[in-house]
Amino acid sequence: MKQKIIFFLVSSLVFSALIILGALRLFNNYETVIILGMSIGFLFGLLITLIMIYIHSSYLRKAGLNKTGLSVVNSIEIEATGNKEEVIALCIETIRSVKKSELGLVNKNKGLLTVNVGVNWRTWGDSIQFEVKAITDHKCNVVITSRPTLRTTLIDLGKNLDNVIKITNDLKSKAQIKVLNNNCNITET
């Protein structure tokens, strides 16, 4: 809800400022211009926010997810069978399940992988990070985090959640995994 209020306020204020600046030449009365600009900006912000809420909710319904705890930064912690090198290789393979993804930083000693996802109509690109930590010789913890590249993103229409779901499902098909910490409310698929 906080994201939607911020989105509403930002879009209202920006559009109000544009209306006020554009209307200053037409009207000599500053009070009329400010009231007109703020009113139109409020209506525009409300309209844009309602459209974004509708699109966002339709993506969630289509994915079969609820709205609780939804964020633009999504992560899940899983336990995978295999040694650290095998699990890192599996993580690199699962990158293909996300469109427009490119492998970025790979640090096998620290168990860090960074993936960059290209721009699409839902976001200005995403950054996916894998943190692989060996528990035993045959088990590893993997934390998968997906976030927008543009840090000021308020609404991503479920794109980063979709990234985490695709990667998790791909890992499930290739290895035996167990979900340890589900921060993005993914139901078992």
Language model regions located:
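Ser/Thr-rich, low-complexity intrinsically disordered terminal regions
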Residues: K2-I5, I19-T189
